[in-house]
Amino acid sequence: MSSPQKTSLAARRRAERMSREAMYEVIRSPLITEKATLLSERSQVVFRVAIDATKPEIKAAVEGLFGVKVIGVNTLVNKGKTKRFRGRPGQRSDVKKAYVQLVAGQAIDLTAKLA
């Protein structure tokens, strides 16, 4: 029996055939924080990604858009806080972040224009 962490072959193949438009839907924006800046020195980059994005999709999108080799992807979901808006309770949206580990020596210049 396979462990729940293993991705199916079909899921990996779907991720490899993603269109450029689908890649932009998976990766929403880079996350620029103090922690992300420190991690960039160790060949890691942090992105805000779609809430339903899988690790193989994130890996394929980063490799396809930025032309780098990805070693691994760690993800987390920040649950939206309950806040009050005009006296009524509301809910902020959940946010999914992806920590992407690149091959040593590679980096992504997030200030450059994507072609």
Swiss-Prot record:
Keywords: Ribonucleoprotein, Ribosomal protein, RNA-binding, rRNA-binding. GO terms for molecular function: rRNA binding; structural constituent of ribosome. One of its GO terms (cellular component) is ribosome. One of its GO terms (biological process) is translation. One of the early assembly proteins it binds 23S rRNA. One of the proteins that surrounds the polypeptide exit tunnel on the outside of the ribosome. Forms the main docking site for trigger factor binding to the ribosome. Part of the 50S ribosomal subunit. Contacts protein L29, and trigger factor when it is bound to the ribosome. HAMAP family: Ribosomal_uL23_B. PANTHER family: 60S RIBOSOMAL PROTEIN L23A (PTHR11620). This is Large ribosomal subunit protein uL23. It comes from Granulibacter bethesdensis (strain ATCC BAA-1260 / CGDNIH1).
